[in-house]
């Protein structure tokens, strides 16, 4: 069976000068300041093979490169490669002339670059560093800065309007630098750099021409008709834009500092693979961080104290793997149903980043000590717009919707509001409550591999069918809605990013790694992606998954348990451990760390038209699947609608469950038993995860300590675990009554929903509404984080 291999996230290397043109022996001259004589020599030689340098001549020579007036050689008698070169050469000249005088006009010399003060300034060691850890004005950025001065003529106090926004000259220079190098420099940094250079270059005619308006331009009172000279060239198609450099690399003789090797990297090769998306969506995901680990008890909850690492983002976070087209992802429509519905919505075109994350998870071979915590931190870094204004000043009301699928079936859905961001970094939760439950079950399977070799294959098959989609949305701030979003409707939230998750299990000798890459699916190319066929007739419930399962048994990893598949555990129970103590606020700061410790927001309305869990997991259903929302937790028709949450029971009698320690949670007495969610996961537990004698309940965000295991199930009142509160949905309040000691519970508000189940307990079903609990085995409760 083929295993999914991880890919290294190395940035594409730039081609060297050795393979450019028929002059490989001039490499050292080109990188050591002799570009003047080198270009003069090349100007009188055959241009074949030097197509990448034609755009440089527009700035170098006072006249346009003449179009050959003599007849071009015919294809008769020429080598095919020569024919291709001739055609390509003619096309380049035609494109170069089509750009007009903005780029091919005469370029004056810049004598200030040879001044003694400028040479001494550039010879200084670069001590100041930017947010990216590199010198603020390295040689590469200085080259781009000098090019930007040429490409953006002085405009005084006037503004350049584009895409409904106004840009000053410094903002245009900052955007030019970013598009050319992929490195962000703010408007204030550009302004400061101009002031530093102006302090010792003021008075130089060439410098004055680049930084101050000429009297002739000022007398007109209008900006140049062509605007910034580089804007049109960057709007060329993607392929032609990268194959022709329209901006000369800044080199000059007498330059004291050795220039960086190679030319300026082609813009957007790594950072922005799609120019159309850049033009319609300024806020891009520039970096990403993701870790999933288990930290030791009585240790800080950070990854520094982790003793097991499930997975971690591999390589440079700001240099993802090469982009991938959406149609090249196998079965993306069934693997990511939410994305499929978004792509099919013609009234709301997709204009945000799509990120594909492929996570290799390394499972644990045994349970961790009692009190261990599961940590998951996910962080997105949105780039700063060219005007230097922070992204959070433009957007507010950030939210994250998470959809988890097994074989295309939605098994989990949650929406959470994100705290107010203080920077461009957004920290969406990744449902550690759900993962803690899964890891507990999968850890038990890994522990029993010697007894059941089929368990390893079942676990791997399970991860292959597991996918997730996360949608990040935000609302434009009130002071910007009127002028930037004039056509906003009642729901004026904007889709900021979509994350696609695929999972695999590592081999025994591998470490868990995660890669991420952009998925290219621009709005302009949506017609190339086949959309679902329009509905013709009466709308019926979808039959793609349910009808086939009713007609014949579908292959699934959740098979009915067989006698030879069940693993019986005859070992003695492990010793009892004390419950995990209430967490301290120092574990994670909600304002500074990853805010994954708050309660889950899981509105009931988010699970509309969801088939009952028993119908989804049962391989041989006998009844018509339910498509209506249950109105109560025990299946009755009375009472207000409650959220039905399946309980994932544990099958190992010696199982240590995750404890979840929460930042804002408190501890109180548990409740009396009441209405609970029916145990709808027995097929899953008995099929892939073995026989079930215990249950593990919902867990909160970010942390999950393992508590005490037991070998028997106590009665209903012996131990309880309360779910975290669900926002955006009002449910009947639950009474807080005293109960037996030595149990764990989270104090919830008056509108919180407490749900739970005890598999196989006859005394729990049929209880009245308003008295709900989530039972768990004695001394094996789950602490919420």
From Swiss-Prot:
Subcellular location: Nucleus
Gene3D superfamilies in the record: TEA/ATTS domain (6.10.20.40)
GO cellular-component term (any): nucleus
UniProt-listed InterPro entries: TEA/ATTS_dom, TEA/ATTS_sf, TEC1_TEAD_TF
GO molecular function, one term: RNA polymerase II cis-regulatory region sequence-specific DNA binding
UniProt keyword annotation of Nucleus present: yes
Span of the signal peptide: none
Entries under Pfam families matching the protein: TEA
Family matches, as SMART domains: TEA (SM00426)
Region (Disordered): 1-22, 213-232
UniProt keyword terms in alphabetical order: Activator, Conidiation, Nucleus, Sporulation, Transcription, Transcription regulation
Keyword Glycoprotein found: no
Gene Ontology biological-process entries: conidium formation; sporulation resulting in formation of a cellular spore
Induction (UniProt): Expression is controlled by brlA.
UniProt superkingdom: Eukaryota
Main location (coarse class): nucleus
Disruption phenotype: Forms aberrant phialides.
Function: BrlA, abaA and wetA are pivotal regulators of conidiophore development and conidium maturation. They act individually and together to regulate their own expression and that of numerous other sporulation-specific genes. Binds to the sequence 5'-CATTCY-3', where Y is a pyrimidine, making both major- and minor-groove contacts. Controls expression of wetA.
Membership in a protein family: Belongs to the TEC1 family.
Protein name per Swiss-Prot or TrEMBL: Conidiophore development regulator abaA
Organism in which the protein naturally occurs: Aspergillus oryzae (strain ATCC 42149 / RIB 40) (Yellow koji mold)
Gene: abaA
């Amino acid at each position: 069976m083929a295993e999914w291999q991880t890919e290294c996230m190395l940035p594409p290397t730039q081609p060297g000068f050795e393979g450019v043109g028929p002059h490989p022996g001039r490499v050292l001259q080109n990188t050591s300041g002799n570009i003047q004589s080198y270009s003069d020599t090349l100007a009188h030689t055959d241009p074949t093979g030097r197509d990448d340098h034609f755009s440089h001549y527009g700035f170098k020579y006072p006249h346009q490169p003449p179009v050959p007036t003599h007849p071009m050689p015919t294809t008769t008698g020429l080598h095919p490669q020569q024919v291709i070169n001739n055609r390509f050469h003619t096309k380049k000249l035609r494109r170069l002339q089509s750009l007009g005088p903005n780029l091919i006009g005469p370029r004056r010399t810049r004598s200030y670059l040879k001044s003694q003060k400028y040479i001494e300034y550039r010879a200084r060691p670069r001590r100041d560093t930017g947010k990216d850890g590199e010198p603020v004005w390295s040689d590469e950025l200085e080259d781009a800065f000098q090019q930007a001065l040429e490409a953006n003529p002085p405009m005084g106090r006037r503004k350049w309007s584009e895409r409904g926004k106004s840009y000053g000259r410094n903002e245009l220079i900052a955007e030019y630098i970013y598009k050319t190098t992929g490195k962000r420099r703010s408007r204030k940094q550009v302004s400061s750099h101009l002031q530093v250079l102006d302090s010792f270059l003021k008075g130089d005619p060439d410098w004055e021409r680049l930084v101050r308006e000429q009297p002739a331009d000022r007398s007109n009172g209008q900006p140049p008709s062509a605007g910034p000279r580089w804007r049109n060239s960057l709007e060329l198609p993607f392929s032609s834009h990268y194959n022709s450099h329209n901006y000369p690399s800044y080199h000059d003789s007498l330059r004291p500092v050795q220039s960086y090797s190679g030319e300026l990297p082609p813009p957007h090769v790594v950072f922005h693979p799609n120019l159309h998306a850049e033009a319609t969506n300024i806020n891009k995901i520039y970096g990403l961080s993701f870790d999933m680990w288990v930290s030791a008890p009585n240790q800080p909850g950070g990854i520094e104290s982790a003793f097991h690492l499930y997975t971690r983002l591999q390589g440079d976070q700001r240099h993802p793997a090469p982009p991938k087209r959406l149609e090249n992802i196998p079965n993306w429509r069934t693997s990511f149903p939410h994305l499929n519905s978004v792509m099919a919505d013609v009234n709301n075109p997709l204009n945000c980043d799509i990120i594909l994350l492929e996570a290799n998870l390394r499972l644990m071979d045994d349970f961790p000590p009692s009190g261990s915590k599961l940590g998951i931190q996910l962080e997105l870094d949105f780039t700063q717009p060219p005007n230097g204004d922070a992204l959070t000043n433009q957007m507010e009301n950030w939210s994250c919707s998470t959809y988890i699928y097994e074989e295309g079936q939605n098994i989990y859905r949650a929406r959470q509001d994100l705290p107010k961001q203080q920077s461009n970094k957004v920290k969406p939760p990744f449902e550690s409550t759900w993962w803690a439950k899964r890891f507990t079950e999968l850890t038990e399977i890994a522990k029993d591999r010697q007894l059941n070799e089929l368990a390893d294959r079942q676990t791997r098959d399970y991860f292959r069918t597991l996918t997730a989609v996360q949608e990040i949305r935000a609302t434009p701030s009130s002071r910007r809605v009127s002028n930037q979003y004039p056509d906003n409707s009642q729901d004026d939230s904007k889709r900021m990013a979509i994350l696609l998750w695929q999972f695999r299990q590592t081999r025994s000798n591998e470490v868990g790694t995660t890669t991420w890459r952009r998925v290219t699916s621009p709005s302009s190319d949506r017609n190339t992606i086949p959309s679902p066929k329009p509905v013709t007739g009466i709308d019926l419930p979808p039959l793609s998954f349910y009808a086939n399962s009713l007609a014949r048994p579908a292959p699934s990893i959740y098979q009915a348990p067989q006698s030879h598949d069940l693993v019986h555990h005859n070992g003695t129970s492990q010793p009892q451990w004390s419950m995990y103590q209430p967490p301290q606020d120092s574990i994670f700061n909600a304002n500074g760390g990853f805010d994954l410790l708050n309660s889950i927001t899981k509105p009931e309305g988010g699970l509309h038209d969801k088939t009952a869990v028993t119908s989804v997991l049962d391989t041989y259903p006998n009844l018509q699947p339910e498509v209506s929302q249950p109105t109560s937790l025990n299946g009755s028709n009375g009472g207000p609608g409650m959220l039905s949450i399946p309980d994932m029971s544990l099958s190992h009698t010696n199982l240590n469950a995750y404890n979840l320690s929460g930042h804002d949670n408190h501890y109180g007495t548990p409740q009396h038993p009441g209405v609970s969610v029916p145990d709808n996961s027995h097929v899953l537990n008995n099929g892939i995860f073995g026989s079930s004698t215990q249950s593990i309940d919902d867990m909160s965000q970010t942390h999950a300590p393992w508590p005490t295991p037991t070998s028997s199930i106590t009665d209903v009142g012996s131990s309880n675990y309360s779910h975290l509160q669900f926002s955006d949905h009002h449910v009947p309040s639950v009474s807080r009554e005293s109960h037996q000691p030595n149990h764990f519970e989270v104090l919830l508000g008056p509108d919180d929903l407490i749900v739970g189940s005890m598999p196989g307990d006859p005394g729990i079903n049929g209880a009245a509404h308003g008295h709900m609990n989530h039972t768990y085995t004695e001394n094996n409760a789950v602490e919420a984080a």
